[in-house]
Amino acid sequence: MALIFICILHCGIWANAVNAFHIFLQITMWRLNDNKVYLPPPGPIASIVSTDEYVQRTNLFYYAGSSRLLAVGHPYFPLKNSSGKITVPKVSGYQYRVFRVKLPDPNKFGFSETTLVTSDTQRLVWGCVGVEIGRGQPLGVGISGHPYLNKYDDTENPSGYGTSPGQDNRENVAMDYKQTQLCIVGCTPPMGEYWGQGVPCNASGVTQGDCPVIELKSEVIQDGDMVDTGFGAMDFASLQASKSDVPLDLVNTKSKYPDYLGMAAEPYGNSLFFFLRREQMFLRHFFNKAGKTGDVVPSDMYIAGSNTRSKIADSIYFSTPSGSLVTSDSQLFNKPLWIQKAQGHNNGICFGNQLFVTVVDTTRSTNLTLCASTDPTVPSTYDNAKFKEYLRHVEEYDLQFIFQLCIITLNPEVMTYIHTMDPTLLEDWNFGVSPPASASLEDTYRFLSNKAIACQKNAPPKEREDPYKKYTFWDINLTEKFSAQLTQFPLGRKFVMQAGLRPKPKLKTVKRSAPSSSTSAPASKRKKTKR
């Protein structure tokens, strides 16, 4: 609302005198308010609750374990034949191992207690309460390197001032990596983050040789992805054109780091029940890289040199990492882990009858050196040309679990909540959600078998696709490896002792009862006879 004042000048003449009077009129005018109006939410927002609110746990526990899991391959790159088919895969101690554990459907189990669940309104799910990740093979440190690493000067202990690198100053350099032990457990795949090439705002203003723009990206961690080895989590394939800035096992790959912040902020907590992490690293050597420096050091940050130092040296420094000592005193594996309270809202419930276990262990990264002779006879003198050298890396795992049988009562509120979280769960449980009534007018023909009209057959329902079929995991099938005899397995015995469960003795000592005097006949004595 605004006020407008109008001034009117009124003149009057009296006796040759001129008088002027000011008359003010006030008029009210409405105009549109410039402030924004914020509407309240249309209704109450459904809050995310813990699985303990709608999952009822039973006193039935089961053990499940995998067989001995082995992986053998080349530690730096996959080997291919002439047709491009991989003959020897890449198996490195600095890769993620993402196990996709498939569990049986508890609703198809035959339990001795027939009144355990009401099939009309209840469904069964598995709850993970214990896990043990076993690791075989001895402790060791594996090294990596590059025969053409872009290493120019030793900037830690320089022998001179290098200002004029040649056309090719690459050298053969090897190193060990950052030490990492990691374990992530959830019912959906883990997420990883890395720095990749982004899209510039003004693509026309970018010239060849400009520094690429980077952005933080998040992807699913797959089995075989490289971990952070000390050179950063980044896409080396798109951000390092020389292919000489990192060791061979990182060239043309992505190094991912677990997105702990993103998984912790996930509303339902399915991807991260819990995680264990141990990282350590120090820097061993310091170098700089040859090449034209893209970001020139500002002239106001130094005083120009003279003679051989008139040209400033390259300032692109880098270091070689090292994970230092590996010891059995700081191992995260080969010990039981009990889940009492998960980090997120999902307290260990295995929705979809599956579990994802992500493992990183660089403390057993020893590379095996193999040698084969090209001559069937033993040479009398040593000749390098008569021997072929090979590299292989081996890994050994063993997974053991303790699962608890749980019940979900599907009332309307719980069904709505689960449908919002994952609609496929209700489909697997043979529960459907009726679609809203359509307000449009639909066509219905009288004669369906009529050549005069288009075919009226309904399209066959599409088979539900695996949502993770485009990702690579190490599939572990435990559908036929469940057992209720906990004391027959190592992790089961540990759980029985931890939980205070005392199994019933199977072998009972039965004492022989003495005969009663009322029923037994007196023993007759033998008469003595004279001879």
From Swiss-Prot:
GO terms for biological process: endocytosis involved in viral entry into host cell; virion attachment to host cell. Residues 500-531 are annotated as: Disordered. One of its GO terms (molecular function) is structural molecule activity. Keywords: Capsid protein, Disulfide bond, Host nucleus, Host-virus interaction, Late protein, T=7 icosahedral capsid protein, Viral attachment to host cell, Viral penetration into host cytoplasm, Virion, Virus endocytosis by host, Virus entry into host cell. One of its GO terms (cellular component) is host cell nucleus. Residues 512-523 have a biased composition (Low complexity). It is found in: Virion; Host nucleus. Self-assembles into homopentamers. The capsid has an icosahedral symmetry and consists of 72 capsomers, with each capsomer being a pentamer of L1. Interacts with the minor capsid protein L2; this interaction is necessary for viral genome encapsidation. Interacts with protein E2; this interaction enhances E2-dependent replication and transcription activation. Forms an icosahedral capsid with a T=7 symmetry and a 50 nm diameter. The capsid is composed of 72 pentamers linked to each other by disulfide bonds and associated with L2 proteins. Binds to heparan sulfate proteoglycans on cell surface of basal layer keratinocytes to provide initial virion attachment. This binding mediates a conformational change in the virus capsid that facilitates efficient infection. The virion enters the host cell via endocytosis. During virus trafficking, L1 protein dissociates from the viral DNA and the genomic DNA is released to the host nucleus. HAMAP family: PPV_L1. Belongs to the papillomaviridae L1 protein family. This is Major capsid protein L1. It comes from Human papillomavirus 43.
